C-alpha cells in the first residue's frame, strides 16, 4: 500500500547503513529525530467539505482527501510528518473518461470551486497543494484513466489515458514489444499526463529524448472547450500547439488523452561505470562524449563529493575498500568522479558504442570497472526517493534541486549553487552536506542536479525555516547565474517567483494571456506556474 506520509510503497524500506550514518555525523553533526504524527491524528483535523452539493464522481472521505493534499517536496514531507497539513481539498474527483472530466469542470464552475489537476502526486515544487481560499477546492485525480487506448504500429504512436504511471505505461507497451523509454526517478508513481504537464526528463533521454520529443499530441479539457492536438511527424503550420501544453502545469486545462512516440524494444541494454581522476577531466570527458554524438542511452557524472557519498552509503564496506584500492593503483584517488553510461540497441551497435566511449574516456584518464556498478545503478535507479525515509529515521533532512545551463557556465553555476547551500545555515552554526551530478547532457550544455542534507531543527517550524532559507539562496543563485529555474521538476508554486528572470515581462504577459484564454475565471491551479 502506498504511504500516506512519504514516498512509495510501505513495504519498501531503504535504511541508512551504520557506516553511512557515521559518515553523515562527521560531516553534518548528530542527527535529530522529530516526532511523527499518526494518520488517525491527521484525520481528526480534516474539516467538513465546503462542497454541499454531492456528485457521484467525487469523494469527500477524509482519508482520500489527506492522500491527495500534498506532493513530495521537503515542505510536503514536513507537513505530512508533523501532521500540520494546513489545507485539505474539499473533495477528490475520480473521472474515468474525457467526458467525465468535462462534466466535472462544468460542475466545479457551478459550485464556484477551484480545480487542481492531480496525476501521481509526486510534485516537488508545490503543484498540487491546496492553499487557503474562500472558494472550495476540488482535486481532480486522473488515477483511473490508465489504459493504452490505441497503438499504431506503423506510425509508432501510442495513445494513453493521462493517469498511467511509469510501470503501467511500460507494462502495456512491452506486452506489444514496445517501450516509451521515459524513466524519471519518480517513474514508479508519476504519470504520463504529469510528465507532459511538467516537461519531464527521463534518465535515458540521451536515446529516447525528453518528454517534449516523445509527446506527439492529445486532448486537453479546458473551461473554454476541448483542445485537440493532432499528430504530425513535423509541421510548419505556425506555432506548435503541443508547446502550449508542455510545461503548462494544469493552468490551461486538464490533459485527457496523451499520444506518444514509442520505440521497439532493444535487443540489448548494458550500463558501465568509469572513474575519472578529477572533476575537470570528468567534465571535459562527458562533454566530449556527448558532442561526439556516440550513440549512448544515458550518461550520469557524479562530482567528487557525490562519488564519495555514494560509495559511503552503498553498504558492503569491504568491497568498497577493494574498489578504492584498485582505483588508486590506476590513478583515480581522492577527488575521483564516477561516470555511469549506458548503451541500448542491437549488440553490434552497442559493442561499437562502448568501444568508442572507452577510447575517448581513456584519453581523459578514465578507469573502467565493467558492468557491476552499472547493474547496481540500474537495479536501484528508482530507490533513491525511499532514502529520504531512512535519512529521516536517522535524524537528517534531505532535498534536491536542479537547473541547466550551457557548457561554458556549468562549472561556475554548479560551484555557486553548492556554495549557496553549503553556507546557507552558517548563521545558525549548522553544516550542510552538498553534492551534485550531471544526468542529462546535450551538445549545448547540461542539467545540474544537487542534493543537500542538513539536520532538522528542534521543531518542525524551525526545520521548514531552514529549508526555506536554503531553497531561496539556491534559487536566487540559479536565476542570477544563467541557469533555468527548472530543468525537469517544473515551476509549481515554489519556483514561480523566479520565472520572470527567464521569460521576461513580455513573455510572462503572453503566458498569462493564454491562461486567461483557456481559463477566464482562473479556476485551474491558481498560483501554479504564474503568480496570481
Regions found by a protein language model. Give the residues of each.
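N-terminal flexible segment immediately upstream of the FAD-binding catalytic core
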Residues: 1-106, 124-156, 308-313, 375-399, ...
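C-terminal substrate-recognition/cap domain of FAD-linked oxidoreductases
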Residues: 54-80, 283-473, 481
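Short, well-ordered beta-strand elements within core beta-sheets of diverse protein domains
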Residues: 90-96, 270-277, 341-343, 401-405
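FAD-binding subdomain of flavoenzyme oxidoreductases
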Residues: 146-302
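Activity-critical C-terminal alpha-helical subdomain
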Residues: 491-532
Amino acid at each position: 500500500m502506498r504511504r500516506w506520509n512519504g514516498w512509495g510503497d510501505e513495504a519498501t524500506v531503504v535504511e541508512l547503513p551504520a557506516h553511512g550514518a557515521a559518515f553523515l555525523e562527521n560531516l553534518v553533526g548528530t542527527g535529530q529525530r522529530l516526532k511523527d504524527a499518526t494518520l488517525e491524528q491527521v484525520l481528526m483535523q480534516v474539516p467538513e467539505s465546503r462542497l454541499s452539493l454531492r456528485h457521484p464522481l467525487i469523494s469527500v472521505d477524509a482519508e482520500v482527501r489527506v492522500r491527495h493534499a500534498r506532493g513530495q517536496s521537503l515542505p510536503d514531507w514536513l507537513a505530512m510528518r508533523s501532521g500540520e497539513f494546513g489545507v485539505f481539498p474539499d473533495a477528490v474527483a475520480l473521472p474515468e473518461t474525457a467526458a467525465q472530466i468535462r462534466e466535472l469542470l462544468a460542475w466545479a464552475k457551478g459550485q464556484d470551486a477551484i480545480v487542481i489537476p492531480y496525476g501521481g502526486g509526486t510534485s516537488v515544487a508545490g503543484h498540487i497543494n491546496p492553499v487557503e481560499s474562500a472558494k472550495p477546492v476540488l482535486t481532480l485525480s486522473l488515477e483511473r484513466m490508465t489504459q493504452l487506448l490505441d497503438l499504431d504500429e506503423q506510425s509508432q504512436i501510442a495513445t494513453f489515458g493521462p493517469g498511467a504511471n511509469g510501470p503501467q505505461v511500460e507494462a502495456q507497451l512491452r506486452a506489444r514489444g514496445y517501450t516509451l523509454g521515459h524513466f524519471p526517478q519518480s517513474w514508479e508513481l508519476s504519470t504520463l499526463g504529469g510528465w507532459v504537464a511538467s516537461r519531464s526528463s527521463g534518465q535515458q533521454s540521451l536515446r529516447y529524448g525528453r518528454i517534449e520529443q516523445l509527446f506527439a499530441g492529445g486532448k486537453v479539457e479546458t473551461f473554454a472547450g476541448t483542445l485537440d492536438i493532432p499528430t504530425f511527424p513535423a509541421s510548419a503550420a505556425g506555432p506548435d500547439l503541443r508547446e502550449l501544453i508542455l510545461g503548462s502545469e494544469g493552468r490551461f486545462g486538464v490533459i485527457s488523452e496523451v499520444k506518444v512516440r514509442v520505440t521497439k524494444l532493444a535487443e540489448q541494454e548494458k550500463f558501465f561505470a568509469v572513474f575519472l581522476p578529477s572533476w575537470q577531466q570528468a567534465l571535459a570527458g562527458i562533454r566530449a562524449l556527448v558532442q561526439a554524438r556516440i550513440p549512448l542511452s544515458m550518461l550520469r557524472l557524479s562530482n567528487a563529493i557525490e562519488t564519495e557519498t555514494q560509495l559511503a552509503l552503498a553498504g558492503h564496506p569491504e568491497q568498497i575498500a577493494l574498489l578504492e584500492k584498485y582505483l588508486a593503483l590506476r590513478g583515480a584517488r581522492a577527488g575521483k568522479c564516477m561516470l555511469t553510461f549506458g548503451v541500448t540497441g542491437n549488440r553490434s551497435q552497442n559493442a561499437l558504442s562502448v568501444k568508442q566511449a572507452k577510447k575517448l574516456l581513456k584519453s581523459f584518464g578514465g578507469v573502467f570497472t565493467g558492468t557491476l556498478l552499472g547493474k547496481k545503478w540500474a537495479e536501484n535507479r528508482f530507490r533513491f526517493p525511499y532514502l529520504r525515509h531512512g535519512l529521516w529515521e536517522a535524524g537528517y533532512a534531505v532535498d534536491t534541486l536542479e537547473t541547466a545551463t550551457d557548457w561554458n557556465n556549468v562549472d561556475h553555476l554548479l560551484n555557486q549553487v553548492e556554495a549557496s547551500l553549503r553556507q546557507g545555515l552558517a548563521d545558525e552554526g549548522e553544516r550542510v552536506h552538498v553534492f551534485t551530478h550531471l544526468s542529462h547532457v546535450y551538445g549545448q550544455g547540461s542539467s545540474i542536479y544537487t542534493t543537500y542534507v542538513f539536520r532538522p531543527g528542534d521543531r518542525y517550524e524551525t526545520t521548514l525555516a531552514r529549508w526555506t532559507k536554503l531553497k531561496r539562496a539556491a534559487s536566487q543563485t540559479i536565476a542570477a547565474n544563467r541557469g533555468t529555474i527548472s530543468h525537469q521538476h517544473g515551476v509549481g508554486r515554489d519556483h514561480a517567483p523566479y520565472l520572470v528572470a527567464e521569460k521576461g515581462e513580455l513573455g510572462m504577459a503572453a503566458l498569462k494571456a493564454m491562461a486567461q484564454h483557456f481559463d477566464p475565471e482562473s479556476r485551474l491551479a491558481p498560483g501554479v506556474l504564474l503568480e496570481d
